[in-house]
């Protein structure tokens, strides 16, 4: 960036006490500049590392520092004496005032008062000794900075709550630009107006440009114009501050105590921390970007660590105790270990200069602060991953200060425990977990459990670290640097403790602190988790932000993420929250994590209210305190454990709770048990969330903590189905472990939780949650016995797994265990858990005392020569079954037994089957012998063996598979395993000419066999991958490749023997489990593979039942009076009244028919008149003949005699007009219809026949739609009528259709018996196809005449369809209204397997007056069927009309309630041949569809 002429007026946040001498910041800068000038003249040499403004200095190349410079630097370093004073040799280089050097453009330095040589303050290597010789030259003045209020709070916050570490941070944002503040001098005794709490938020914006870096030694300028002065070169210090928000000011190793004067002036450490001010109500509110007073320089980037360069006195300073800095508003409060201020010290510029000199002298690393990313290992000057500026003020021995949490600021010594005094406005907070008290305005505040002495630290709303500059007294307290939010002021030396420090619990290995991974635990058990200061089962989230060059925008205040959900609106005033809580930075922080778990996903047992504690009493009796913040109304569900002491107590309480001991809280205000559920899931951290910042120096998991948490979660005294949650800090990459009752620690990974779940209140109280033993007590004896047997099976299976060398995490084993868990249900307690089964299995196998009672019977089927016997030998490991490569080795069914891993296995070896269709009879005989052996030794597993290298898609094995299914039943495939031998065969070439991959080859061959089995069983649903039989590969060749253990392996690396045995064991265990839990259900072979039992089609059977049927009548030649038709009786009666019409035909004049030659001579009108007269005479003749027939039948009834046998033939059943169908002409069978084509292949002449002489009528059935004209006749139809015992007329009609695929048979047979003149009974037997099954129908009905023109029929039927039986009844009534109109109504019901169908029919028949002479008639019918709640309506119309003398039109139409139906029109004519032109219509439609196919497909389009 361009250099600016900035004139910072120096101020000091560290004020020297009155009476002390010191020098101003300007004097120090001037002295450094003069030293640089003297160096150029060969005089004085700078005592600090030279920070050049060149690119080399920025990049940190150490090559630029010559040996001469280093030696000169060492020579000119201030000599540090034991008391911490600076030797007089340095006086000369620091006395004179200096202006801005001219070498590079630098901000002008306002000259201040000169500082004496003896006033220069340096830090000694020991923490205890700090020079007392530093004083203030002018005691009557001090510097005060009037800083205008920063209006925009967002300028002091890190944008998006994160800091970019992986890129060089260029300060180009206008929002982060700070303004140089005016400086005016005031008396030293004056206090700041804001009680010493000044704050300047931001981050150190390190620019890779270094044009404005002062070249002189000891004086530096950042890209923002900040002046950095290294005041004393000391020994090298290695301060490993690896977390964001960490600032080390002062000694990192020595025992000096850097104190602030008694005037309680403020030490400014603004790390994105807002200042807390007072509002009108006397409560605290976070005031971001307050006017900062007495600040010499302002760091303008968004996460800067600011320390004023005010005058410090060199006095004994003890390490400021780590201060737990308050998080952002909306989070849990932290313990503030109040540290004493720095009574005496040095200016901040001197501190920086000394640290720079140390780094230069000890490590020779020229890693410039302005050079972008600063290495963590550099001594003296550092940047953490949040962009915080870390400076070592003293050169001491190499110390690794591992402050492993964000928001940690290290200022001064760490060795001793001092309490930072506050002005008393902030309530004391101890151990980060404090009870909730009542503030002045009714607001909630934290009351410290333990009295802290003179706390001076203040908490700000932004989650930043601020160190008060008030005077601090040395006290003893425990230091845990590894906790989040800890501020370390002073030096941090490993294993060095202050002499007067009486606390032995100080961490002595600060440099290598094992940071326990914060685990978030949510329980649904019946115990209450309580720590000494904590009264809840809470979530402690691991605060391990990913650090590295690839990390993007991690939030500074990310040490503890809890509280407010809204990251943008989380600025709750201090007036409403006197304790500070962190906010969950989601959305803006770590934007690359898409699967963040919001706050509402984090289940906790306690929730805080900012506007007053509001406890909602749940139905379970447990209180839930909800958050009612002013700006964020989201409920927080998390409790934070931040300190190591709290974590230890928490783990101890977990141990107690896990053993069933209820822990109670000592906090009176929040003593309710608030354990929540997370839906039976256990959430753990992903392995990918490992922090890479510390480079392996610290352990990510505290194994003891993790073990205790897991122990409490996985059944150690917890209630059934105990659930446990371990989550990462930001809720990303969660994995769930569902532990249903009885499964304990069974882990089941789920997909990352992406969507937030709604907040869940407590739904289970302690009274409803029972322990495992109580659950087991509540089980009935029968259930206990089932669970015990199930547990025994589980133990057996686990022992078998152990013997096979497989683990429970194996894919097949995991599926079996999962199914066992589902069958056990959630009622299983700890006694029947998976952990108990695993433990027992391991113990049983280790001891070897308990015998494994498990046996296996395996039936081996397959074609000849596929390797059945060789597979048996390979499994048993011995040459037991004889094998022959050139012939059949197995000629009969035999049993072969052996022991494998302690399991007795019995094989049923069978002879090879043949796949040819002609050999299936031989296969059936062999399979009958197999069936006999199966009755003696029922097989548990069936191995269908085939070769892998001979599979084709021609389905040649289908006849064989169908024979197996027919002989042994479909249940034979229930526990079948497809075993493919010769598995080491090379795959064939694929379509591209290259060999197929092995996996593709195996998959194709497996699918072929599975598909064949599905077709053989007869249900294509077996081709569903979830229902297919498992496939196992086998290679029996002695030269098969082996692994190191000598076990045969396949080309894919699989050990086939153990895999096949595992499949067998798994199917046997699952089969035993099913029979164990459901012994009452009989085996239904129809339900094998999930087959749905087909219910009979009741609507179809009902419609078949409701049809009207004519009763057979005796032929006239057998003396039967078949006059049982009401219509015929009516006609007989009517004929008596029409006797006068009998003479009408006789009264006609004679009529001479004309010949064709004569008709041709007639005109059209004459020809028409002739035909009308001819038709009229023919009709009169037919009427006369009909009446004579009726009279004869009437005489037959009266006389009981046989009349007219010789002169009249009996009109058959076809003449019965009551069915409404046109009467058939009683003529012999005519010639077949014209063929569809007139080619030579149509050999219709072959089927011509003469008039039959017997009652058996046989004719072929032509398939007019077939493609084969020569052999298009694929069926035969036979009809026969006879009289049984000369009394019972009977008819039978059978039609058989057979082709290559189907065989259909249709049979209608009836026999009737008369009951006097008014009644008749008929019985019938029908066979017809219903789908692929044959339905056998036995029916019967009785018809009787109750009125003159009314006839009633009552009937029923029984239908046998497979294993189903359907019964039905019907009622029918027929009434004749005159001679033309007939009404027919029928109703009935059909019932099968508790299912019923109801139906009704109504038909109206209309005939012409001369019926049956005239054939014109019409019928209209309505049908209604109700089945399974569905109502089906249908309408049918049939009409037959004569058009002209020789033309007829037949119309048939049907429509149902779903608006679907059909219309059929038939036209026949022997006069109008032009009617054949109508065939052009379908041809034209076909042509139109071929031209425009889209026109017809639009309405069927799915779019």
From Swiss-Prot:
The modification Phosphoserine is found at residues 71, 210, 281, 288, 448, 461, 589, 609, 630, 632, 665. GO terms for biological process: protein import into chloroplast stroma; protein targeting to chloroplast. NCBIfam families: 3a0901s04IAP86. Its main location: plastid. Its EC number is 3.6.5.-. GTP binds at residues 865-870, 884-889, 982, 1035-1036. This is Translocase of chloroplast 159, chloroplastic. Residues 85-98, 176-210, 447-456 have a biased composition (Basic and acidic residues). Residues 981-984 are annotated as: G4. Its cofactor is Mg(2+). Residues 889-893 are annotated as: G2. Residues 781-804, 1175-1203 form a coiled coil. Pfam families: AIG1, TOC159_MAD. Keywords: Chloroplast, Coiled coil, Cytoplasm, GTP-binding, Hydrolase, Magnesium, Membrane, Metal-binding, Nucleotide-binding, Phosphoprotein, Plastid, Plastid outer membrane, Protein transport, Receptor, Transmembrane, Transmembrane helix, Transport. Residues 853-1087 form the AIG1-type G domain. Mg(2+) binds at residue 869. One of its GO terms (cellular component) is chloroplast envelope. The gene is TOC159. It comes from Arabidopsis thaliana (Mouse-ear cress). Residues 1035-1037 are annotated as: G5. GO terms for molecular function: G protein-coupled receptor activity; GTP binding; GTPase activity; metal ion binding; protein-folding chaperone binding; ribosomal small subunit binding; transmembrane signaling receptor activity. Residues 884-887, 947-952 are annotated as: Homodimerization. Induction: By light conditions. Phosphorylated by KOC1.
């Amino acid at each position: 960036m361009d250099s600016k002429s900035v004139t910072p007026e120096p101020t000091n946040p560290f004020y020297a006490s009155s009476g002390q001498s010191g020098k101003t910041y300007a004097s120090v800068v001037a002295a450094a500049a003069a030293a640089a000038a003297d160096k150029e003249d060969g005089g004085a040499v700078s005592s600090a590392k030279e920070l050049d403004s060149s690119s080399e200095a920025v990049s940190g190349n150490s090559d630029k520092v010559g040996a001469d410079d280093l030696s000169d630097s060492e020579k000119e370093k201030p000599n540090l004496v034991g008391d911490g004073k600076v030797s007089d040799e340095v006086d000369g280089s620091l006395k004179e005032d200096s202006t801005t050097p001219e070498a590079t453009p630098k901000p002008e330095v306002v000259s201040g008062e000169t500082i004496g040589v003896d006033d220069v303050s340096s830090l000694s290597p020991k923490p205890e000794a700090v020079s007392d010789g530093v004083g203030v030259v002018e005691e009557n003045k001090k510097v005060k900075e009037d800083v205008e209020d920063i209006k925009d709070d967002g300028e002091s916050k890190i944008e998006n709550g994160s800091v970019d570490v992986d890129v060089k941070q260029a300060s180009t944002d206008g929002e982060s630009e700070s303004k140089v503040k005016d400086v005016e001098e005031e008396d030293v005794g004056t206090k700041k107006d804001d009680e010493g709490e000044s704050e300047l938020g931001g981050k150190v914006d390190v620019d890779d440009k270094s044009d404005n870096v002062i070249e002189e030694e000891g004086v530096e300028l950042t890209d923002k114009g900040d002046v950095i002065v290294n005041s004393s070169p000391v020994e090298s210090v290695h301060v490993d501050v690896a977390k964001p928000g960490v600032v080390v000011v002062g000694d990192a190793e020595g025992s000096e105590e850097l104190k602030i004067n008694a005037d309680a002036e403020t030490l400014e450490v603004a790390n994105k921390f807002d200042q807390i001010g007072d509002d009108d109500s006397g409560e605290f509110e976070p005031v971001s970007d307050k006017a900062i007073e007495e600040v010499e320089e302002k760091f303008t980037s968004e996460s800067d660590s600011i320390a004023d360069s005010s005058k410090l006195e060199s006095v004994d300073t003890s390490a400021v105790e780590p201060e737990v800095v308050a998080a952002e508003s909306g989070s849990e409060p932290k313990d503030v270990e109040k540290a004493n201020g720095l009574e005496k010290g040095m200016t901040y510029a001197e501190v920086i200069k000394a640290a720079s000199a140390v780094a230069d002298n000890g490590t020779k690393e020229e890693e410039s602060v302005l050079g972008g990313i600063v290495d963590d290992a550099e001594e003296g000057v550092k940047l953490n991953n949040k962009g915080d500026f870390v400076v070592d003020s003293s050169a001491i021995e190499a110390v690794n200060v591992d402050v492993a949490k964000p928001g940690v600021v290290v200022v001064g010594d760490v060795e001793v425990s001092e309490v930072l005094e506050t002005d008393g406005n902030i309530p004391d907070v101890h151990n980060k977990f404090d009870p909730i008290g009542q503030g002045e305005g009714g607001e909630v505040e934290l009351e410290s459990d333990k009295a802290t002495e003179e706390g001076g630290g203040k908490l700000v709303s932004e989650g930043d670290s601020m160190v008060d500059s008030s005077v601090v007294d040395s006290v003893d307290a425990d230091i845990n640097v590894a906790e989040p939010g800890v501020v370390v002021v002073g030096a941090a030396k490993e294993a060095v403790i202050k002499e007067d420090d009486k606390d032995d619990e100080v961490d002595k290995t600060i440099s290598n602190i094992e940071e326990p991974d914060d685990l978030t635990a949510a329980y649904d058990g019946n115990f209450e988790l309580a720590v000494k200061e904590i009264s809840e089962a809470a979530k402690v989230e691991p605060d391990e932000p990913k650090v590295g060059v690839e990390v993007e925008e991690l939030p500074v205040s990310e040490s503890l993420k809890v509280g407010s959900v809204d990251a943008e609106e989380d600025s709750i005033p201090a007036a409403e929250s006197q304790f500070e809580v962190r906010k969950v930075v989601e959305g803006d922080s770590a934007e690359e994590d898409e699967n963040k778990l919001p706050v509402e996903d984090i289940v906790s047992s306690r929730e805080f209210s900012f506007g007053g504690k509001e406890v909602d009493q749940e139905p379970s009796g447990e209180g839930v305190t909800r958050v009612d913040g002013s700006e964020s109304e989201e409920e927080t569900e998390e409790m934070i454990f931040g300190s190591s002491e709290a974590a230890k107590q928490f783990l101890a309480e977990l141990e107690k709770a896990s053993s069933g001991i209820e822990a109670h809280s000592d906090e009176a205000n929040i003593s309710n048990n608030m354990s929540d559920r997370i839906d039976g899931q256990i959430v753990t951290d992903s392995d990918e969330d490992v922090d890479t910042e510390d480079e392996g120096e610290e352990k990510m998991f505290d194994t003891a903590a993790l073990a205790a948490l897991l122990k409490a979660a996985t059944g150690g005294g917890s209630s059934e189905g105990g659930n446990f949650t371990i989550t990462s800090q930001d809720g990303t990459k969660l994995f769930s472990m569902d532990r249903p009752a009885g499964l304990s620690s069974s882990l089941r990974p789920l997909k990352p939780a992406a969507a937030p779940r709604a907040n869940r209140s407590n739904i289970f109280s302690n009274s409803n949650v029972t322990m495992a033993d109580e659950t087991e007590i509540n089980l009935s004896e029968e259930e206990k016995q089932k669970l015990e047997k199930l547990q025994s099976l589980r133990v057996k299976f686990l022992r078998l797994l152990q013997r096979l060398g497989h683990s429970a995490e194996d894919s097949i084993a995991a599926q079996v265990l999962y199914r066992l868990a589902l069958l056990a249900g959630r009622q299983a307690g700890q006694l029947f858990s998976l952990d108990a089964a695993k433990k027992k299995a391991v113990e049983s196998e280790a001891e070897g005392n308990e015998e494994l009672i498990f046996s296996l019977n395996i039936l081996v089927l397959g074609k000849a020569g596929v390797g059945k016997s060789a597979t048996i030998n390979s499994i048993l490991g011995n040459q037991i079954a004889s094998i022959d490569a050139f012939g059949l080795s197995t000629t009969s069914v035999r049993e072969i037994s052996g022991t494998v891993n302690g399991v007795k296995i019995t094989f049923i070896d069978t002879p090879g089957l043949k796949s040819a269709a002609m050999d299936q009879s031989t296969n059936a005989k062999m399979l009958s012998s197999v069936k006999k052996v199966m009755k003696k030794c029922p097989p548990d597993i069936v191995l269908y063996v085939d070769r892998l290298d001979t599979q084709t898609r021609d389905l040649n094995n289908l006849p064989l598979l169908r024979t197996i299914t027919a002989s042994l039943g479909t249940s034979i495939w229930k526990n079948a395993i497809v075993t493919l031998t010769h598995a080491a065969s090379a795959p064939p070439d694929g379509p591209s000419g290259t060999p197929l991959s092995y996996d593709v080859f195996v998959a194709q061959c497996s699918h072929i066999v599975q598909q064949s089995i599905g077709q053989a069983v007869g249900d294509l649903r077996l081709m569903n991958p979830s229902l297919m039989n498992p496939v196992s590969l086998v290679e029996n060749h002695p030269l098969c490749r082996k692994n190191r253990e000598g076990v045969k392996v396949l080309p894919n690396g699989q050990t086939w023997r153990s895999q096949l045995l595992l499949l067998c064991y798994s199917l046997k265990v699952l089969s035993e489990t099913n029979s164990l839990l459901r012994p009452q259900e009989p085996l239904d072979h129809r339900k094998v593979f999930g087959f749905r039992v087909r219910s009979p089609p009741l609507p179809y059977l009902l419609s078949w039942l409701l049809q009207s049927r004519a009763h057979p009548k005796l032929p006239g030649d057998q003396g039967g009076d078949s006059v049982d038709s009401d219509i015929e009786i009516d006609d007989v009666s009517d004929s008596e009244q029409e006797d006068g019409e009998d003479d009408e035909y006789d009264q006609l004049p004679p009529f001479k028919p004309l010949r064709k030659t004569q008709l041709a001579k007639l005109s059209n009108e004459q020809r028409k008149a002739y035909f009308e007269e001819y038709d009229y005479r023919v009709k009169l003749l037919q009427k006369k003949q009909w009446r004579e027939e009726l009279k004869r039948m009437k005489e037959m009834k009266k006389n009981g005699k046989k009349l007219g046998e010789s002169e009249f033939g009996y009109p058959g059943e076809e003449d019965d007009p009551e069915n409404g169908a046109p009467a058939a002409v009683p003529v012999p069978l005519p010639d077949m219809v014209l063929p569809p084509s007139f080619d030579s292949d149509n050999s219709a002449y072959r089927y011509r026949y003469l008039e039959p002489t017997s009652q058996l009528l046989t004719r072929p059935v032509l398939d007019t739609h077939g493609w084969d004209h020569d052999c298009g006749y694929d069926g035969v139809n036979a009809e026969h009528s006879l009289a049984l015992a000369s009394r019972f007329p009977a008819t039978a009609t059978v039609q058989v259709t057979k082709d290559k695929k189907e065989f259909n048979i249709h049979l209608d047979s009836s026999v009737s018996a008369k009951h006097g003149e008014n009644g008749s009974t008929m019985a019938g037997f029908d066979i017809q196809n219903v789908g692929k099954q044959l339905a056998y129908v036995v029916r019967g009905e009785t018809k009787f005449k109750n009125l003159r023109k009314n006839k009633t029929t009552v009937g029923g039927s029984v239908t046998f369809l497979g294993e189903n039986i359907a019964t039905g009844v019907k009622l029918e009534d027929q009434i004749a209204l005159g001679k033309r109109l007939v009404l027919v109504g029928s109703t009935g019901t059909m019932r099968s397997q508790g299912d019923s169908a109801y139906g009704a029919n109504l038909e109206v028949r209309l005939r012409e007056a001369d019926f049956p002479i005239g054939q014109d008639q019409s019928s209209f019918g309505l049908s209604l069927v109700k089945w399974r709640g569905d109502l089906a309506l249908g309408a049918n119309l049939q009409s037959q009309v004569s058009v002209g003398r020789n033309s007829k039109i037949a119309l048939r139409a049907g429509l149902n309630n779903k608006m679907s139906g059909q219309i059929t029109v038939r036209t026949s004519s022997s006069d109008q041949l032009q009617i054949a032109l109508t065939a052009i219509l379908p041809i034209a439609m076909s042509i139109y569809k071929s031209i425009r196919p889209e026109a017809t497909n639009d309405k069927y389009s799915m779019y």
